[in-house]
Curated annotation (Swiss-Prot):
Main function: Involved in oxygen transport from the lung to the various peripheral tissues.
Gene Ontology annotations of biological process type: hydrogen peroxide catabolic process
Record keyword Iron present: yes
Keyword Iron: yes
Pfam families, alphabetized: Globin
Residues the record lists as binding heme b: 92
Keywords associated with the record: Heme, Iron, Metal-binding, Oxygen transport, Transport
Residue stretches making up the Globin domain: 2-146
UniProt-recorded name of the protein: Hemoglobin subunit beta-1
Tissues where the protein occurs: Red blood cells.
GO molecular function, one term: peroxidase activity
TM annotation in the entry: none
Cellular component annotations (GO), alphabetically ordered: blood microparticle; haptoglobin-hemoglobin complex; hemoglobin complex
């Protein structure tokens, strides 16, 4: 993807509004609740039997912070997201064996929660650029699967 200067500015402004500490845990928790089959990748996290258990699970919160931080790291290298996510792609493909469609699902949950948290301050142009970014990051993470 070739990002325009305007898209880069929109993405960085959008991400600057994201409360990583809050949205990170919520994003993974919502993914695990709404798409329960994704829980199989987190069996070593312990109790994921209810939404409350997932939200209060310290391992889920730590993994979510790492995931959201990695997403933020991709923003620092928008012109080469595939290279920035190469190690994560290899790890998810070769060690975790995560179904790559889950990367897109996680990104969609992140966009939904962010928009809900932004309220009226969420602009359609920024949400469209963030949705394109989620697709680029999901593709970069799934790259080692091909």
């Amino acid at each position: 993807v070739h990002w325009t200067a305007e898209e880069k500015a929109l993405i960085n402004a959008y991400w600057g509004k994201v409360d990583v500490g809050s949205v990170g845990g919520e994003t993974l928790a919502n993914l695990l609740v709404v798409y329960p089959w994704t829980q199989r990748f987190f069996e070593d996290f312990g109790n994921l039997s209810t939404p409350s258990a997932i939200l209060n699970n310290p391992k889920x919160x730590x993994x979510x912070x790492x995931v959201i931080t990695s997403f933020g790291d991709a923003l620092k290298n928008l012109d080469n997201v595939x290279x920035x996510x190469x190690k994560l792609s290899e790890y998810h493909c070769n060690k975790l064996h995560v179904d790559p469609v889950n990367f897109r699902l996680l990104g969609d949950v992140l966009i939904t929660l962010s928009a809900a948290n932004f309220g009226k301050x969420x602009x359609x142009x920024x949400x469209x650029x963030x949705x394109x970014l989620v697709g680029v990051v999901a593709h970069a993470l799934a790259r080692r699967y091909h």
